């Protein structure tokens, strides 16, 4: 007889190989066809709401690995929240306005298109990009409302954004002023703080002499009767700002020295600089000298010095006063700072504090980076081309003390990678320290209080955002662009004042934009709204900062705190969001702008929690770079290994820091995936012939080890759900892997194989095991589903078509409409766990000893062994309680327990009996049945009799 055929060998249509890259697109298509997202919404209706608001990626270019990380993390959270019993929608969004798209239109069609044409082409381009990105996001297994995303360029969104502008204007936060702002010559526009990055750059560093003018006043400041001719010396890395100099700054508490030097410089024998900087400066200039007098910086306030180019051109024949500044340091330079208020924030603040009018500020640099033609000596030159010319002019005027090359970290545009300057222009601002009209706290105060009330994951994000808000300048709202939401103001042509009915007019404009998009503002004739007043006003041409676009989506998409705005998705979502989740750069981006708009509109943040993930680097910790050749595209991984591998990589990596990825790392992830898949295959194969409705064993009648397995599963489930709740995904993955490999594979399933395969197919022993396995399988699949979505869905379909087929709510469309599995409580759960924890420890000792005996060649498999265990009272009771089932737990042919006062002692010997050809146990009763001499007594009983007596394992 072929006894192999008498075994209950496992069988399942769930294949060993996932073939993920080939099969996943089919699941994506099926989810689309069967409207899985809509099914989730229907199943979740009426539950507590959980809102993750999607930070919109920019609608330009293909998605990269960072996008994949971001979307997968969001998908894990939304799916896990739905399965935890929440109603968690996912409405994806896209950021659609702004410079990068304008650049693409310029590249394709040239720079001089009419504004309306730029806008229509930009809108069409953004839609094309969204379609490309949407396809790639869906390929990652991300479920969401892909047919109805929010777009910042939707007419309704553009209109509501104008309404948001009206509300913060009405509250008193918005003002117009001349201030130095980050300016990109290539953009031709102001930049937000988040649009500035730093890179090393080499610039000329120069020491420049400003000649004395009123030598009598200077002598008195130093307590002298008189002084010779000379100059005060400054140090700067921006020679191009020298033509715009309007003041000098010294620190009030620093000691300054008059130094008589030789050989005598052009402007005279005396030089004025900080005492502490005299020695290194003279050495650098090749001079010798002695200090003739010192004075505190405060004594120099108000003294005036001649412009260093006064001798070179009449246009520079002016003097600059000394102002006091606490920001002056002695780290480098001379301890004297030159001030060009149009091109430096501290310079601007200092000069304004001393009464300099906006109209008197010198700003010869135009928006394209060139000096105005009227500027003496350098008119028409770009500031960078002018640098060497200015240095040469200073040298000819006798005002150049030293020029050196300096490599330093400098501001650059994040789009063009070109240098950015501070440039004073007339812009619209949201005031950080302005008190709103209702008398409440300033924007800075309410934002800082809001940070304190927000949960941060990881916790260090709080200090980072707090420091940014505490130190940031006013928010420059305006941009000089074409493809953006207009700051739809009417400005008086003579006074520059806003129309007195501006808030009302903004609503009228918003109504038109709602029907025709921002193009409606472009084509609007002011007479339509202003009537006869139209001649007095002009349309403001500025657009809103794109960070205002995305930063106000909590109002335009979620509906805001008061629901006054229409909002595109207010019915599905809610304000405030439970969570915003983005990369760590968004502390200065979307997190930041959303916080400010939320606090201006409603007095507190639009989110309860902020989750930050790090950037992706290669296996050596280097940034992804095409030039280095270490870029890993998510599309390529999906097409070769499968998106499931990307999902598992994201979930198993600590996202709070940098996420490392390489071919080698992905190879290890593939191995982890295979182990999980093999566990699932075993589980599915062993419940394939099981009917959950008609064949389940009551929980109270389960074998002891089966009850322990369920208690163990419940403990694991609680831990994993806790990790999901706290957004700790890599410990969740680790726990699931440990459960599959150690708790199941190396322990429970290893022991269970004998009972599953050798007992009668319909026996209580086998059905007890299958009852437990079905609960374990359901628990495991539902816990895995947020991460391994394709695999969990595939396995769920197999399970729904077999063991669960006869349940009342079958067939189930998808695993994603399920909630986490409800496992039975066991009154003796703690006692069971304590007992079996000790049994597992003893089993591990036995296995170690068995391996020693096997290595010595005394036995082949562990089933050839017979074990005697000598145990103290406590261990003896535990081991003896299993009776003959102990041998199945230890996977040996005989296990005998002996009482002993000492600690555990294990003796192992090879069995002297014959091997059963069916169960492979070596038993004394093999051959005793004349009809079946090849098998043992229990196999005879299982095949032809009442079945073996067995209750523990």
Curated annotation (Swiss-Prot):
<dbReference type="InterPro" id="IPR023585">
    <property type="entry name" value="Ile-tRNA-ligase_type1"/>
</dbReference>
<dbReference type="InterPro" id="IPR009080">
    <property type="entry name" value="tRNAsynth_Ia_anticodon-bd"/>
</dbReference>
<dbReference type="Pfam" id="PF06827">
    <property type="entry name" value="zf-FPG_IleRS"/>
</dbReference>
<dbReference type="InterPro" id="IPR014729">
    <property type="entry name" value="Rossmann-like_a/b/a_fold"/>
</dbReference>
<keyword id="KW-0963">Cytoplasm</keyword>
<dbReference type="GO" id="GO:0004822">
    <property type="term" value="F:isoleucine-tRNA ligase activity"/>
</dbReference>
<keyword id="KW-0067">ATP-binding</keyword>
<comment type="function">
    <text>Catalyzes the attachment of isoleucine to tRNA(Ile). As IleRS can inadvertently accommodate and process structurally similar amino acids such as valine, to avoid such errors it has two additional distinct tRNA(Ile)-dependent editing activities. One activity is designated as 'pretransfer' editing and involves the hydrolysis of activated Val-AMP. The other activity is designated 'posttransfer' editing and involves deacylation of mischarged Val-tRNA(Ile).</text>
</comment>
<dbReference type="InterPro" id="IPR033708">
    <property type="entry name" value="Anticodon_Ile_BEm"/>
</dbReference>
<feature type="binding site">
    <location>
        <position position="582"/>
    </location>
    <ligand>
        <name>L-isoleucyl-5'-AMP</name>
    </ligand>
</feature>
<feature type="binding site">
    <location>
        <position position="939"/>
    </location>
    <ligand>
        <name>Zn(2+)</name>
    </ligand>
</feature>
<protein>
    <recommendedName>
        <fullName>Isoleucine--tRNA ligase</fullName>
        <ecNumber>6.1.1.5</ecNumber>
    </recommendedName>
</protein>
<dbReference type="GO" id="GO:0002161">
    <property type="term" value="F:aminoacyl-tRNA deacylase activity"/>
</dbReference>
<feature type="binding site">
    <location>
        <position position="936"/>
    </location>
    <ligand>
        <name>Zn(2+)</name>
    </ligand>
</feature>
<keyword id="KW-0648">Protein biosynthesis</keyword>
<keyword id="KW-0030">Aminoacyl-tRNA synthetase</keyword>
<feature type="binding site">
    <location>
        <position position="919"/>
    </location>
    <ligand>
        <name>Zn(2+)</name>
    </ligand>
</feature>
<keyword id="KW-0436">Ligase</keyword>
<dbReference type="InterPro" id="IPR010663">
    <property type="entry name" value="Znf_FPG/IleRS"/>
</dbReference>
<feature type="binding site">
    <location>
        <position position="626"/>
    </location>
    <ligand>
        <name>ATP</name>
    </ligand>
</feature>
<dbReference type="InterPro" id="IPR013155">
    <property type="entry name" value="M/V/L/I-tRNA-synth_anticd-bd"/>
</dbReference>
<keyword id="KW-0479">Metal-binding</keyword>
<feature type="short sequence motif" description="'HIGH' region">
    <location>
        <begin position="57"/>
        <end position="67"/>
    </location>
</feature>
<dbReference type="Pfam" id="PF00133">
    <property type="entry name" value="tRNA-synt_1"/>
</dbReference>
<dbReference type="GO" id="GO:0008270">
    <property type="term" value="F:zinc ion binding"/>
</dbReference>
<dbReference type="InterPro" id="IPR009008">
    <property type="entry name" value="Val/Leu/Ile-tRNA-synth_edit"/>
</dbReference>
<dbReference type="InterPro" id="IPR001412">
    <property type="entry name" value="aa-tRNA-synth_I_CS"/>
</dbReference>
<dbReference type="Pfam" id="PF08264">
    <property type="entry name" value="Anticodon_1"/>
</dbReference>
<keyword id="KW-0547">Nucleotide-binding</keyword>
<keyword id="KW-0862">Zinc</keyword>
<feature type="binding site">
    <location>
        <position position="916"/>
    </location>
    <ligand>
        <name>Zn(2+)</name>
    </ligand>
</feature>
<comment type="similarity">
    <text>Belongs to the class-I aminoacyl-tRNA synthetase family. IleS type 1 subfamily.</text>
</comment>
<dbReference type="GO" id="GO:0005524">
    <property type="term" value="F:ATP binding"/>
</dbReference>
<dbReference type="InterPro" id="IPR050081">
    <property type="entry name" value="Ile-tRNA_ligase"/>
</dbReference>
<dbReference type="GO" id="GO:0000049">
    <property type="term" value="F:tRNA binding"/>
</dbReference>
<dbReference type="GO" id="GO:0005829">
    <property type="term" value="C:cytosol"/>
</dbReference>
<comment type="subunit">
    <text>Monomer.</text>
</comment>
<feature type="short sequence motif" description="'KMSKS' region">
    <location>
        <begin position="623"/>
        <end position="627"/>
    </location>
</feature>
<dbReference type="InterPro" id="IPR002300">
    <property type="entry name" value="aa-tRNA-synth_Ia"/>
</dbReference>
<dbReference type="GO" id="GO:0006428">
    <property type="term" value="P:isoleucyl-tRNA aminoacylation"/>
</dbReference>
<dbReference type="InterPro" id="IPR002301">
    <property type="entry name" value="Ile-tRNA-ligase"/>
</dbReference>
């Amino acid at each position: 007889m072929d006894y192999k055929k008498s075994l209950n060998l496992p069988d399942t249509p769930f294949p060993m190989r996932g073939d993920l890259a080939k099969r996943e697109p089919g699941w994506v298509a099926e989810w689309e066809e069967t409207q899985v997202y809509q099914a989730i919404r229907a199943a979740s209706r009426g539950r507590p709401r959980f809102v993750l608001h999607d930070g919109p990626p920019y609608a330009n270019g293909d998605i990269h690995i960072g996008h994949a990380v971001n979307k997968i993390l969001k998908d894990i959270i939304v799916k896990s929240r739905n399965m935890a019993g929440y109603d968690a929608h996912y409405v994806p969004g896209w950021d659609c306005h702004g410079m990068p798209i304008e650049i693409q239109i310029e590249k394709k069609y040239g720079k001089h298109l009419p504004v309306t044409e730029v806008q229509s082409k930009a809108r069409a381009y953004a839609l094309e990009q969204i379609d490309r990105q949407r396809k790639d996001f869906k390929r990652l297994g991300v479920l969401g409302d892909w047919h109805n995303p929010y777009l910042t360029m939707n007419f309704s969104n553009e209109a509501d954004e104008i309404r948001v502008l009206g509300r913060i204007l009405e509250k008193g936060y918005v003002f117009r002023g001349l201030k130095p702002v980050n300016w990109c010559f290539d953009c031709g526009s102001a930049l937000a703080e988040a649009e500035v990055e730093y890179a090393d750059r080499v610039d000329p560093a120069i020491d420049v002499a400003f000649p004395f003018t009123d030598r009598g006043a200077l002598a008195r400041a130093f307590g002298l009767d008189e002084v010779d001719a000379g100059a005060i010396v400054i140090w700067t890395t921006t020679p191009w700002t020298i033509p715009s100099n309007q003041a000098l700054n010294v620190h009030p508490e620093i000691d300054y020295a008059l130094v008589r030097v030789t050989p005598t410089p052009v402007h005279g024998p005396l030089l004025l600089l900080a005492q502490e900087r005299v020695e290194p400066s003279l050495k650098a200039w090749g001079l010798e000298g002695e200090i003739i007098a010192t004075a505190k910086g405060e004594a120099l306030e108000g003294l005036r010095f001649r412009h260093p180019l006064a001798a070179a051109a009449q246009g520079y024949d002016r003097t600059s006063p000394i102002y006091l500044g606490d920001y002056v340091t002695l780290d480098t330079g001379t301890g004297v700072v030159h001030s060009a208020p149009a091109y430096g924030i501290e310079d601007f603040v200092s000069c304004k504090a001393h009464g300099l009018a906006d109209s008197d500020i010198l700003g010869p640099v135009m928006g394209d980076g060139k000096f105005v033609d009227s500027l003496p000596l350098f008119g028409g030159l770009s500031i960078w081309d002018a640098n060497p010319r200015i240095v040469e002019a200073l040298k000819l005027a006798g005002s150049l003390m030293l020029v050196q090359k300096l490599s330093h970290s400098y501001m650059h545009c994040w789009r063009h990678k070109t240098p950015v300057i501070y440039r004073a222009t007339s812009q619209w601002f949201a005031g950080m320290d302005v008190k709103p009209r209702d008398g409440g706290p300033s924007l800075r105060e309410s934002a800082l209080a809001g940070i304190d009330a927000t949960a941060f994951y990881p916790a260090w994000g709080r200090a980072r955002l707090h420091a940014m808000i505490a130190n940031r300048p006013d928010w420059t709202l305006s941009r000089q662009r074409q493809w953006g939401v207009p700051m739809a103001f009417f400005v008086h042509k003579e006074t520059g004042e806003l129309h007195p009915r501006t808030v009302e007019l903004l609503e009228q404009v918003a109504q038109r934009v709602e029907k025709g998009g921002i193009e409606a503002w472009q084509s609007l004739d002011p007479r339509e709204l202003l009537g006869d007043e139209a001649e007095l006003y002009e349309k403001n041409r500025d657009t809103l900062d794109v960070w205002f676009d995305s930063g106000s989506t909590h109002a335009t998409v979620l509906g805001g705190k008061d629901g006054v705005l229409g909002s595109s998705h207010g019915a599905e979502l809610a304000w405030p969001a439970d969570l915003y989740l983005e990369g760590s750069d968004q502390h200065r981006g979307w997190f930041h702008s959303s916080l400010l708009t939320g606090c201006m509109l409603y007095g507190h943040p639009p989110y309860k929690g902020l989750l930050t993930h790090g950037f992706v680097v290669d296996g050596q910790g280097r940034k992804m770079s095409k030039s280095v050749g270490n870029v890993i595209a998510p599309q390529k991984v999906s097409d070769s290994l499968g998106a499931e591998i990307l999902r598992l990589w994201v979930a198993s990596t600590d996202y709070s820091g940098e996420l490392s990825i390489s071919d080698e790392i992905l190879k290890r992830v593939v191995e982890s995936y295979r182990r999980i898949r093999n566990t699932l295959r075993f589980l599915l194969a062993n419940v394939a012939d099981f009917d959950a409705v008609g064949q389940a064993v009551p929980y109270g009648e389960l074998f002891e080890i089966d009850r322990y397995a369920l208690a163990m599963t419940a403990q694991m489930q609680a831990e994993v759900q806790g990790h999901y709740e706290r957004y700790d995904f890599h410990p969740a993955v680790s726990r699931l892997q440990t459960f599959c490999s150690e708790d199941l594979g190396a322990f429970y399933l290893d022991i269970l194989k004998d009972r599953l395969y050798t007992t009668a197919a319909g026996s209580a022993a086998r059905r007890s095991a299958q009852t437990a396995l079905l609960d374990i399988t359901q628990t495991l699949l539902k816990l895995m589903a947020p991460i391994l979505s394709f695999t969990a869905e595939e396995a769920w379909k197999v399970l729904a078509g077999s063991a669960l087929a006869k349940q009342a709510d079958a067939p189930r469309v998808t695993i994603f409409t399920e909630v986490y599995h409800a496992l039975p409580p066991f009154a003796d759960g703690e006692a069971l766990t304590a007992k079996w924890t000790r049994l597992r420890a003893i089993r591990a000792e036995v296995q170690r000893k068995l391996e020693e005996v096997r290595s010595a060649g005394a036995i082949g498999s562990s089933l050839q062994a017979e074990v005697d265990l000598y145990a103290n009272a406590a261990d003896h009771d535990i081991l003896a309680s299993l009776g003959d089932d102990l041998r199945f737990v230890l996977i040996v042919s005989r296990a005998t327990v002996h009482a002993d006062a000492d600690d555990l002692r294990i003796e192992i010997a090879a069995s002297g009996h014959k091997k059963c050809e069916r169960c492979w146990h070596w038993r004394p009763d093999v051959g005793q049945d004349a009809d079946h001499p090849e098998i043992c007594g229990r196999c005879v009983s299982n095949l032809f009799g009442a079945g073996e007596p067995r209750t523990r394992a």
